[in-house]
From Swiss-Prot:
Keywords: Cell membrane, Glycoprotein, Membrane, Phosphoprotein, Postsynaptic cell membrane, Signal, Synapse, Transmembrane, Transmembrane helix. Glycans are attached at N26. Residues 211-558 are cytoplasmic. The lineage of its organism: Eukaryota, Metazoa, Chordata, Craniata, Vertebrata. Residues 148-181 have a biased composition (Gly residues). This is Protein shisa-7. It is found in: Postsynaptic density membrane.
Length: 558
């Protein structure tokens, strides 16, 4: 009985000394931390043996000194108490909850502070009190679980194990942990996003307001530009002597004079009508009258009062308009560039036309290429008495529309251009006038062709007339082919009409030149027609001209 009391007292002391004892050290060696746990284990074994019905003699002093083999067998029969692994933060910042090592023989919490697991060897047991990763790291935001894990006590009769409430100072069991910096971090992100959005909105609004503010003065300035231009032109043109000019140049009431009608502001400050051809007075770019830095506006008197703005004349420098927008000067410079390019194009066309014209020289023994020639040009036929198209009644249509070449537009009116070798107006007789002439005119033309050569001193010779008629007949008949007419000879009635214009009588010129030899005309046999004008195209190498060539491609007669 005294032995039982002694054992009970020792067991109570051991259970009381458990919670109040010091923290276990970090020593994980196989040696027990002190003699008290071994003594308690020995006492538990003895208590179990006594409860099993052992004799009282086994409680002697020799019974406490058992062999090691018998101690190991008793320990194998009674498993050690389960150990609790406390919750911790691993190397990834994740919180691992508390777990209890109570499965099989895995009764001890082993491993490291950042990686814990259950094991069955006591010597591998981890001293959890020496670890410091129980609080949230600064860089981790994962909150711990709201409720701490519940740890069970050890075996029967065991005290509170490590990890239970009160085992660590400021125990974490049951404590609700909050994520460190969760509130401030989230609010900071929202604040930053709000500030950026507000700054963007303010910038866009400021840009829109600045653009509107800058656009309004520009529009006002553009509206005032025509008025300033009109004022400048009015002052440079001198005092307005004509009332209509004063009325047209004034944009405010009261400037036209007492006797003028009440002026009003025009609907359009610019002239919407096309200026007349009289305003297009251009000068050659190379001439001293046309300089790139001088604006010279010269206009004829206006045909109607509606062209007031186009009739303002001034001969001033560009520097007087320097305060105006650059669009005026740019427009004038572009016009100058266009005129220069047109002048170069005209020179090129004139050179090509001159070269082609020189290549069209007639070979010997052929008929002339042109239907008419100017008086005195020669060419194998005596045409001294020919008249112009106006005298022959074959003049072109009245008022022909002519597109003037670039040399005419840009050339100086006071001197002839170096490229002025275009065909005269008398040469520009269309083919239709030749083909549509009357049969009477054709007959007179053939009679004129077969007449003897004219001479102011010698009368006509019948022998010469017969030889000329025979030569023309042979030419028209041709070698073994259809009769072909002459090409390029003077048209019908040229000599008779010209002589009538000069002397006032319709008789042929060779009769008057010969001194009135009427017998020769009576004895001359009538001419038999050998061909028509429609057969001109059958003459080899001589075709009807499809168009009249001029000195420039830009000059066209309609």
């Amino acid at each position: 009985m005294p032995a039982l009391l002694l054992l009970g007292t020792v067991a109570l002391l051991a259970s009381a000394a458990g919670p109040a004892g010091a923290r276990p050290s970090n020593d994980t060696s196989s040696v027990a931390p002190g003699p008290l746990p071994a003594l308690l284990a020995h006492l538990r074994r003895l208590t179990g043996a006594l409860a099993g019905g052992g004799s009282a003699a086994g409680t002697s002093a020799n019974a406490t000194k058992t062999s090691p083999a018998s101690g190991t067998g008793a320990a194998a029969r009674a498993p050690p108490p389960a150990e609790l692994c406390h919750g911790y933060y691993d190397v990834m910042g994740q919180y691992d909850a508390t777990f209890n090592c109570s499965t099989g023989s895995y009764r001890f919490c082993c491993g490291t502070c950042h990686y814990r697991f259950c094991c069955e060897h006591r010597h591998m047991r981890l001293a959890q009190a020496s670890c410091s990763n129980y609080d949230t790291p600064r860089w981790a935001t994962t909150p711990p679980p709201l409720a701490g894990g519940a740890g069970g006590a050890g075996g029967a009769g065991g005290g509170p194990g490590p990890g239970q409430a009160g085992w660590l100072e400021g125990g974490r069991a049951g404590g609700a942990g909050g994520r460190g910096g969760e509130g401030p971090g989230g609010s900071t992100a929202y604040v930053v996003c709000g500030v950026i959005s507000f700054a963007l909105a303010v910038g866009v609004g400021a840009k829109v307001a600045f653009s509107k503010a800058s656009r309004a003065p520009r529009a006002h300035r553009e509206i005032n530009v025509p008025r300033a231009l009109v004022d400048i032109l009015r002052h440079q043109a001198g005092p307005a002597t004509r009332p209509d000019r004063a009325r047209s140049s004034s944009l405010t009431p009261g400037l036209g004079g007492p006797d003028s009608m009440a002026p009003r502001t025009p609907k359009n400050l610019y002239n919407t009508m096309k200026p007349s051809n009289l305003d297009n007075l251009h000068y050659n770019v190379n001439s001293p009258k046309h300089h790139a830095a001088t604006l010279d506006w010269r206009a004829m008197p206006p045909p109607s009062p509606s062209l007031h703005y186009s009739t303002l004349s001034c001969s001033r420098s560009f520097h007087n308009l320097s305060h105006l927008p650059p669009s005026y000067e740019a427009a004038v410079k572009s016009e100058l560039n266009r005129y220069s390019s047109l002048k170069r194009l005209a020179e090129k066309d004139l050179d090509e036309a001159y070269l082609k014209r020189r290549q069209l020289e007639m070979p010997r023994g052929t008929l002339p290429l042109h239907a008419l020639r100017r008086p005195g040009t020669g060419g194998g036929y005596r045409m001294d008495g020919w008249g112009g198209p106006e005298e022959l009644g074959l003049a072109p249509a009245p008022n022909p529309r002519r597109v003037m070449s670039q040399e005419h537009l840009l050339g100086d009116g006071s001197r002839a251009s170096r490229y002025e070798f275009t065909l005269p107006r008398a040469r520009l007789v269309s083919q239709e006038h030749l083909l549509l002439s009357s049969p009477e005119a054709l007959r007179q033309s053939r009679e004129h062709l077969l007449s003897p050569p004219r001479s102011p001193a010698l009368p006509p010779d019948p022998t010469t007339r017969a030889s000329l008629a025979a030569s023309h007949s042979n030419l028209l008949l041709g070698p073994g082919g259809p009769p072909t007419p002459l090409h390029g000879l003077p048209p019908s009635g040229l000599h008779a009409h010209h002589h009538h214009a000069l002397h006032g009588s319709p008789q042929p010129a060779w009769m008057s030149d010969a001194g009135g030899g009427g017998g020769t005309l009576a004895r001359r046999p009538p001419f038999q027609r050998q061909g028509t004008l429609e057969q001109l195209q059958f003459i080899p190498g001589h075709h009807l001209p499809q168009h009249l060539r001029t000195a420039s491609k830009n000059e066209v007669t309609v």
